Amino acid sequence: MLLPKRVKHRKQMKGRMTGKPCRGISLSFGEFGLQATECGWLDSRQIEAARIAMTRYIKRGGKIWIRIFPDKPLTSKPAETRMGKGKGSPDSWVAVIKPGTILYEMEGVSEEVAREALRLAAHKLPVSTKFITRSENHEA
């Protein structure tokens, strides 16, 4: 599972997911990619589940890049605890996703295999996504 080695502050504010991303919107490594079309939080477990789904489908062919990293701590209070008495302890890590962010990239496989592998990965994620290729990506 992905998580930062160390952080400056243990707890963070919720923040807002408005606007467009300023980086990570074009394919940088692979031929095919999975691009988010809405905003949301991706948990480190969801990122890992999607990665496993892709690697199991493509078996030993191709290469996969994970373009997002969960660096925002989510806190939670214990069950049956009264309100107040401070913020809860860090529980899990999430990556903040904005529309247009590239989540995964892939190369070394045919387009049909990549499309199916990324479709399986998209089912594991809580945000809607679309399949993109380097030829239709305007930045490349």
From Swiss-Prot:
Biological processes, Gene Ontology terms: translation
This protein's GO CC annotations: cytosolic large ribosomal subunit
Keywords assigned: Ribonucleoprotein, Ribosomal protein, RNA-binding, rRNA-binding, tRNA-binding
Transmembrane portions of the chain: none
InterPro entries: Ribosomal_uL16 (IPR047873), Ribosomal_uL16_bact-type (IPR000114), Ribosomal_uL16_CS (IPR020798), Ribosomal_uL16_dom (IPR016180), Ribosomal_uL16_sf (IPR036920)
GO molecular function annotation: rRNA binding; structural constituent of ribosome; tRNA binding
Protein family: Belongs to the universal ribosomal protein uL16 family.
Assembly behavior: Part of the 50S ribosomal subunit.
Function: Binds 23S rRNA and is also seen to make contacts with the A and possibly P site tRNAs.
Protein name according to UniProt: Large ribosomal subunit protein uL16
Organism, scientific name: Pelobacter propionicus (strain DSM 2379 / NBRC 103807 / OttBd1)
